[in-house]
């Protein structure tokens, strides 16, 4: 029947040139194309003015004409923690040269910086900006080793052609620096990533310079909660990746914390804590409330002891003192496997630790828990407060600080009491951080005076009522 119908209409069928051309074109593709999917182009609905295209990135693909909208770029170079550029338009990223091209439709869009370009802290007429996308801006000890990324405002003729299109935004940042230090992993990478990407609900791709593969394995649960896509090793990337939106650099507000007034959706550290609870399936959102619990149930106290310096020399005495005031106590060196460490910490109501990266585990404590930081000798009080004193309060937890005396420091076994190490640490601070780190963080252990420390334990117990 189908053949008969064709035959009936055959006299007029080939009188239409457009139809004839279509049939010939299809036959040509079937006969001569090795694989039709090599030329696949998928169009999806996008934001008005920014057509969304996902193109097969094979090298046999022939570049299609690209609509170039007016570029929008906002860079902030005045923040004291990090430089960040956010852009929208036709964006092309070439990893092997660490370049991000924001394409303008004409020279007129570029001259004078362009109407959609807003860069604070730099020349308003600039068309090229250099960023080290790591959140320790100004630190001479680490920033020279951070890969520099260049953002360029160019015309289409100056930009490399696209090899691969993406329908989600990109975030470009460095995984170098202090990567591997537990505190810096959260402070320099994870929390800034949360601030910069969480509002995108996983629809974002991370383009990472100095990518440490093991790091993404260690924090897999967190990374997969922030992006649905495999993070890209940008330094090894040979293709030109194209996006409609991109951010170069990460937003960072303060040490181990978030300023909700500056964060998308007013995200706070409470939101970050709940994010961690979700990613690690932590059961306890709130610490014990002793007045509401069975009176036979004791609050649990975790004493974190360090493997190297700044250890508790008299750990047994500290545990006995805490048990004496009413805590159920455990002393531990936490598992390096993050899910196991997170689960363990979440089961406690209070934590005691000497200033150091172990205190970073406070992010896994339930809300209303108590954090006790023991501050070693050497005028470390300000640093201790910034790094581990403010964050607990921002996470709806309680914070207590115990500053040790010279008698409680093992430095008294190394230096005479009349030494400047005890009498005047300030010149040592002014001389160099390396010297401070060597003496006060690298040579010192702690022998707590448990009688002097007992009121702090009682205060912690009171805060849990």
From Swiss-Prot:
Q: In which pathway does it act?
A: Glycan metabolism
Membrane disposition: Single-pass type II membrane protein
Q: Which residues lie on this side of the membrane: Cytoplasmic?
A: 1-11
Give the EC number(s) under which this enzyme is classified: 2.4.2.-
Q: Where in the cell is it found?
A: Golgi apparatus membrane
Tell me the enzyme class. Answer: transferase
- Membrane-spanning residues: 12-32
Q: Which keywords, in A-to-Z order, does the entry hold?
A: Cell wall biogenesis/degradation, Glycoprotein, Glycosyltransferase, Golgi apparatus, Membrane, Signal-anchor, Transferase, Transmembrane, Transmembrane helix
Glycosylation, residue list: 80, 118, 125, 266, 403
Q: Which GO terms describe its biological process?
A: plant-type cell wall organization
Any one GO molecular-function label of the UniProt entry: UDP-xylosyltransferase activity
- Principal place where this protein is found? Golgi
- The superkingdom listed in its UniProt entry is Eukaryota
Q: Name one GO cellular component term.
A: Golgi membrane
Topological domain, Lumenal: which ranges? 33-465
Q: Which InterPro entries match?
A: Glyco_transf_61_cat (IPR049625), Glycosyltransferase_61 (IPR007657)
Report where it is expressed, by tissue: Widely expressed.
According to its UniProt entry, the function of this protein is described as: Glycosyltransferase involved in the xylosylation of xylan, the major hemicellulose (non-cellulosic component) of primary and secondary walls of angiosperms. Possesses beta-1,2-xylosyltransferase activity, transferring xylose from UDP-xylose to the xylan backbone. Catalyzes the addition of 2-O-xylosyl side chains to the xylan backbone.
- Spell out the family assignment given in the record's similarity comment: Belongs to the glycosyltransferase 61 family.
Question: What protein name does the entry list?
Answer: Beta-1,2-xylosyltransferase XYXT1
Q: Which organism is it from?
A: Oryza sativa subsp. japonica (Rice)
């Amino acid at each position: 029947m189908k053949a008969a119908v064709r035959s009936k209409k055959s006299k007029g069928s080939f009188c239409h040139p457009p139809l004839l051309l279509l049939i010939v074109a299809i036959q040509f593709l079937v006969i001569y194309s090795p694989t039709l999917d090599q030329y696949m182009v998928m169009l999806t609905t996008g934001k008005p003015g920014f057509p969304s295209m996902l193109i097969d990135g094979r090298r046999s693909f022939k570049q299609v004409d690209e609509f170039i909208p007016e570029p929008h770029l906002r860079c902030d170079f005045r923040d004291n923690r990090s430089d960040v550029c956010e852009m929208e338009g036709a964006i092309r990223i070439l990893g092997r040269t660490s370049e991000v091209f924001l394409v303008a439709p004409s020279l007129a869009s570029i001259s004078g910086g362009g109407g959609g370009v807003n860069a604070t802290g730099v020349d308003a007429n600039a068309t090229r900006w250099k960023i080290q996308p790591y959140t320790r801006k100004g630190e001479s000890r680490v920033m020279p080793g951070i890969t520099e990324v260049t953002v360029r405002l160019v015309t289409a003729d100056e930009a490399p052609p696209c090899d691969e299109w993406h329908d989600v935004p990109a975030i470009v940042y460095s995984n170098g620096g202090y990567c591997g230090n537990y505190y810096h992993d959260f402070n320099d990478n994870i929390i800034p990533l949360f601030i910069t990407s969480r509002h995108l609900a996983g629809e974002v791709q991370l383009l990472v310079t100095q990518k440490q593969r093991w790091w993404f394995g260690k924090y897999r649960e967190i990374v997969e909660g922030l992006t649905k896509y495999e993070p890209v090793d940008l330094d090894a990337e040979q293709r030109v990746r194209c996006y409609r939106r991109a951010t170069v650099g990460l937003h960072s507000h303060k040490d181990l914390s978030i300023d909700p007034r500056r964060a998308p959706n007013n995200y706070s550290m409470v939101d970050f804590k709940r994010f961690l609870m979700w990613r690690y399936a932590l059961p306890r959102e709130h610490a014990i409330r002793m007045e509401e619990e069975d009176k036979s149930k004791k609050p649990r106290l975790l004493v974190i002891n360090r493997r190297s310096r700044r250890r508790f020399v008299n750990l047994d005495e500290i545990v006995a003192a805490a048990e004496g005031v009413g805590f159920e106590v455990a002393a531990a060196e936490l598992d390096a496997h993050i899910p196991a460490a997170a689960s363990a910490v979440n089961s406690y109501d209070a934590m005691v630790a000497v200033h150091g990266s172990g205190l970073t585990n406070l992010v896994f404590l339930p809300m209303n828990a108590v954090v006790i930081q023991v501050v070693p000798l050497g005028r470390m009080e300000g640093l201790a407060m910034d790094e581990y004193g403010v964050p607990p309060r921002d996470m709806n937890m309680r914070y207590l600080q115990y500053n040790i005396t010279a008698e409680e420091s093992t430095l008294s076994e190394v230096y005479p009491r009349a030494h400047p190490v005890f009498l005047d640490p300030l010149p040592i601070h002014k001389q160099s951080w390396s010297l401070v780190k060597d003496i006060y963080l690298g040579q010192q252990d702690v022998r707590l005076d448990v009688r002097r420390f007992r009121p702090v334990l009682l205060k912690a117990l009171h805060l849990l009522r």
